[in-house]
Amino acid sequence: MLTLKKSMLLLFFLGTINLSLCEQERDADEEERRDDDEMDVEVEKRFLPLFLPKIICVITKKC
């Protein structure tokens, strides 16, 4: 009975460690995704001011 309790306690302990490691990895993945989204927004902000005057010029034909 004592051996069974020890092995169950060990399994519970290892499972808890595994769960916490998975949560940390998931959090890190979410942060990476969030960083990629922020980079995309920055690229869009830099892209629009460069080509917006040219697009307006082509549309209005007042170049």
Curated annotation (Swiss-Prot):
Protein known as: Jingdongin-1
Disulfide-bonded cysteines: C57-C63
Principal cellular location given in the protein's record: secreted
Regions that span the bilayer: none
GO BP of this protein: defense response to bacterium; defense response to fungus; killing of cells of another organism
Subcellular location: Secreted
Role played: The synthetic peptide has antimicrobial activity against Gram-negative bacterium B.dysenteriae (MIC=35 ug/ml), against Gram-positive bacteria S.aureus ATCC 2592 (MIC=4.7 ug/ml) and B.subtilis ATCC 6633 (MIC=9.38 ug/ml) and against fungus C.albicans (MIC=18.75 ug/ml). Has no activity against Gram-negative bacterium E.coli ATCC 25922 but exhibits low hemolytic activity at concentrations up to 200 ug/ml.
InterPro entries (UniProt xref): Frog_antimicrobial_propeptide (IPR004275)
Maturation-removed propeptide residues: 23-44
Top-level taxon of the source organism: Eukaryota
One family name in Pfam for this protein: FSAP_sig_propep
Keywords of this entry: Amphibian defense peptide, Antibiotic, Antimicrobial, Cleavage on pair of basic residues, Cytolysis, Disulfide bond, Fungicide, Hemolysis, Secreted, Signal
Organism expressing this protein natively: Amolops jingdongensis (Chinese torrent frog)
Record family assignment: Belongs to the frog skin active peptide (FSAP) family. Brevinin subfamily.
Signal peptide: 1-22
GO cellular component, as recorded: extracellular region
Tissue: Expressed by the skin glands.
Lineage, top ranks: Eukaryota, Metazoa, Chordata, Craniata, Vertebrata
